[in-house]
Amino acid sequence: MRLVDLLKGVKHEIKGNPNVDISGVCYDSRKAKPKYLFIAIKGFKTDGLLYVEEAIKNGAVAVVTDRDISEYPGVTVVLVEDARAAMAKIASNFYNNPTSKLTLIGITGTNGKTSVTYMLKAILEQQNNKVGLVGTIQNMIGDRVIPTTHTTPESLDLQELFSLMVNEGVKYVVMEVSSHSLALHRVDSCDFDIAVFTNLSQDHLDFHESMEEYAKTKSKLFKMAKKASVINIDDKYSSMMIESSKGKVLTYGIKDFAYVMAKEIKNSLSGVKFKVQIQDKKEEISLKIPGLFSVYNALAAITVADFLGIPLRSVREALSHVTVKGRFEPVETGRDFYVFIDYAHTPDGIRNIMEALKEYEAGRKILVFGAGGDRDKSKRPLMGEVAGKYADFCILTSDNPRSENPKEIIAQIEEGIKKTNCPYVVIEDRREAIRYALSNAQKDDVIILAGKGHETYQIIGDKVIPFDEREIVKEILAESEK
């Protein structure tokens, strides 16, 4: 493919031969090969500009950059306004605009993205469609799993994945869209058909300057979706998403009047039942994941299905089987108490999970949690305060401390929990914290291990240590039987 064809739709200046033949594109100099185009993007930890020479040495014949660089003999230099934005368009051109051949559904919001994608995948597959999934836990084509590194991969990886999906006969793609991916142009040049808004609460304020900025970034998705926007009307940021919408707006909710509504909600530890109403249509829905947040997630999926013309009866059948790894996931203990694993790692996430247990009074609600290092620090005391308000007992521990001191992270959570009357202990080692919870559990207690969810590792310093809470619970219980 000629360089000039790859640059269609990209504002640029060229120094060198615009007709040079390009056989591949990369943003990692180690992946450069003869006849490759290297795109120098600025990352969080390093800068592609530092690796231009290495890319050329490995065979790159052209370089895209948004800053001036030295000229290299025989190498074409393309100067653009924003290398990340340019990469998204170049990637789409290189892979022949794969999203134009797919029905692409993007889901954004602080909480619920993963559950909604899995619910939609189940609904669409029940209609015998081949479905692709792009998400936090994994990427999938049908039942085949493709490992992930970010919630949303870089635009080049994403377009390659979409191209693979097209080649394998995928019709629908359900995709989690993070605020980072919108801000960093990773999903530019994605041809979204439907955008879904779940909710917005405090998270990622280490990256976005304020909640308004965070919301504004999320709203970009609704400008991109050409057919429909599906919006949680009960969320205070819904009006911003509605104003940004280009396609048909469909709302869902529980409190305020909406196109799709849930009534007669009955919650228990084993799931939640409710009646869904879409104008004059009604159906009873049964979910295996309990809680009001679960009802909201299902409503989002139901609204999309309704827009796509899928019968409500089929939707009911598909939703009755859905479970999501690390989302209110029960762990079999063989004891007289309960253990659940959940990804809740924000104040709102913790509130949602504890609200789901609100009516449960048979035993104590014990919460084991920490907060991630090198991430939004302002949410830590809020997490402590919310936990203290809802739990009967808390065990403060480590999550993924990364480069931070775990003791300091825990101290910041403590500031919040001290504002409540909730008794708590601090056990920095997460395995020992889980051991303490299990060994002190009484009949009918519910233990929530919050924060890790689907993750099977812990990041301490720069080391990634295997840490699967399902296995750890089993090991500790087996040890106690000896």
From Swiss-Prot:
Pathway the protein takes part in: Cell wall biogenesis; peptidoglycan biosynthesis
Compartment list: Cytoplasm
Cofactor names: Mg(2+)
Record-linked Pfam families: Mur_ligase, Mur_ligase_C, Mur_ligase_M
Catalytic activity entry: UDP-N-acetyl-alpha-D-muramoyl-L-alanyl-D-glutamate + meso-2,6-diaminopimelate + ATP = UDP-N-acetyl-alpha-D-muramoyl-L-alanyl-gamma-D-glutamyl-meso-2,6-diaminopimelate + ADP + phosphate + H(+)
Post-translational modification: Carboxylation is probably crucial for Mg(2+) binding and, consequently, for the gamma-phosphate positioning of ATP.
One term of GO molecular function: ATP binding
Record PTM N6-carboxylysine, positions in chain: 218
Motif (Meso-diaminopimelate recognition motif): 399-402
Enzyme class: ligase
Classification via InterPro entries: Mur-like_cat_sf, Mur_ligase_C, Mur_ligase_C_dom_sf, Mur_ligase_cen, Mur_ligase_N, MurE/MurF_N, UDP-N-AcMur-Glu-dNH2Pim_ligase
GO CC list: cytoplasm
Main location: cytoplasm
Record EC number: 6.3.2.13
UniProt KW Transmembrane keyword: no
Keyword tags: ATP-binding, Cell cycle, Cell division, Cell shape, Cell wall biogenesis/degradation, Cytoplasm, Ligase, Magnesium, Nucleotide-binding, Peptidoglycan synthesis
GO-annotated biological processes: cell division; cell wall organization; peptidoglycan biosynthetic process; regulation of cell shape
Binding site for meso-2,6-diaminopimelate: 375, 399-402, 451, 455
Residues bound to UDP-N-acetyl-alpha-D-muramoyl-L-alanyl-D-glutamate: 29, 151-152, 178, 186
Protein task: Catalyzes the addition of meso-diaminopimelic acid to the nucleotide precursor UDP-N-acetylmuramoyl-L-alanyl-D-glutamate (UMAG) in the biosynthesis of bacterial cell-wall peptidoglycan.
HAMAP family xref list: MurE
Record-linked NCBIfam families: murE, PRK00139.1-2, PRK00139.1-4
UniProt family annotation: Belongs to the MurCDEF family. MurE subfamily.
Protein name as it appears in the record: UDP-N-acetylmuramoyl-L-alanyl-D-glutamate--2,6-diaminopimelate ligase
Annotated organism of origin: Caldanaerobacter subterraneus subsp. tengcongensis (strain DSM 15242 / JCM 11007 / NBRC 100824 / MB4) (Thermoanaerobacter tengcongensis)
Name of the encoding gene: murE
